[in-house]
Amino acid sequence: PGPEMATMIERARFAEFYTGPGTNFQDITLEEAIAKATQEKKHIFIECHTDGCVPCKMMKDKVFPHDKMAEYLNREFVSISVDNENGDGPQIMEKYDVQMFPTYIILEPNGELCDIIMSTETDIDLFIKKIEEVKNLK
């Protein structure tokens, strides 16, 4: 198979990961995430990545499947994952001026920005602490 097929397969694997066990990254738009977060009284966690991003893959493989991280994010957030080139990705990257990957955007249930985290923290407790601090800024 050519490079296009390899890219399609990689995207399918990435999508499969985000709907598999671990952190529940929902396949919904930001607008839908805001509506859901408002209804469920949860914050919004946006994971921003790009194809070929090695640190993004490391976080995907080591952090988000972890039971403690998944339990925390699934309980406290409506989580979505966005690619810088697809779906809502380009608009989100522009709106929040995302320049580096991975970047994590934390929003209030109504969609207001809490803050942005740029991190490759693989210590689950430290990463949760960092997210919790940002979530509680307002």
Predicted regions and their residues:
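N-terminal leader/targeting and pre-domain segments
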Residues: 2-40, 136-137
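Extracytoplasmic/secreted proteins, especially bacterial periplasmic and envelope-associated proteins
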Residues: 4, 28-32, 55-58, 68, ...
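Extracellular/periplasmic catalytic domains that process cell-envelope and extracellular macromolecules
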Residues: 38-39, 71-74, 97-100
